Amino acid sequence: MTTIRSIDFETTGIPSEADPQAIVEIGWQDIEYDGMGWAGLVPEGRGSFLCNPGRPIPHEAMAVHHITDEMVADASGNVGLIGAPDYFCAHNADYERQFHNPGVPYICTYKVALRLWPEAPSHGLQFLRYHLNLPVVSAEAFPPHRAGPDAYLGAALMVRILEEGRASLEEMVRWSNGPALLPRVNFGKHKGAKWEDVPLDYLEWVANKSDLDRDVKANARHHLKARAA
């Protein structure tokens, strides 16, 4: 049986080279997967704890997760306590990876959802909860933007992904290590168009001459390669 640990971090802010930021809360929910289409949540494999970030929590971050300096003043949790399962998963796992990258493979449920359900109007975790009618216990998924409930909801999404059976764990890890494969253009004169409908010369400009971000340029290269196949 394979253990996949869904995790979520609440933090002091978005990390950068100049300011790595810090974790204020960690949540997790374990999933067991038999490799043949069955997956389920582990009732006793769930929890959350607060972490003292060693710095004041900005009000902008408090406004998202409602964790205050007073709440974490005596917290003793640290990221090492979440252990080393067979896989980690997280929604927008690139974010969690910036705070914890122990060598365990990560699966990004956001990047996988983009590939499995490209026509979904949104791929945010809360939207997918309702769009896919995930069988969650509402009290366990509340409040949003707290680490325990978000890890639980992310695990429910991961179970649905595994039940779909459309990609192996290894394939999902590969997708997660690459760019987010966006279904539609989200900028410029072709905003809203499907990438496969964008003119070839525009794809070439995005891929080779623009200063757009890594994911956007990778999307253009992906579709250029697909057309050349």
What are these model-predicted stretches?
Residues M1, A228-A229:
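Short intrinsically disordered terminal tails
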Residues T2-S6, A18-I67, G83-A193:
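Metal-dependent phosphoesterase core characteristic of DEDDh/y 3'-5' exonuclease domains
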Residues F9-E17:
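Short acidic, Gly/Ser-rich segments with clustered Asp/Glu that frequently serve as metal-coordination loops
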Residues T68-I82:
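A short, well-structured juxtamembrane/interface segment
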Residues N177-A218:
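Acidic, Ser/Thr-rich low-complexity intrinsically disordered segments
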Residues V216-A228:
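Charged, low-complexity intrinsically disordered segments and flexible loops
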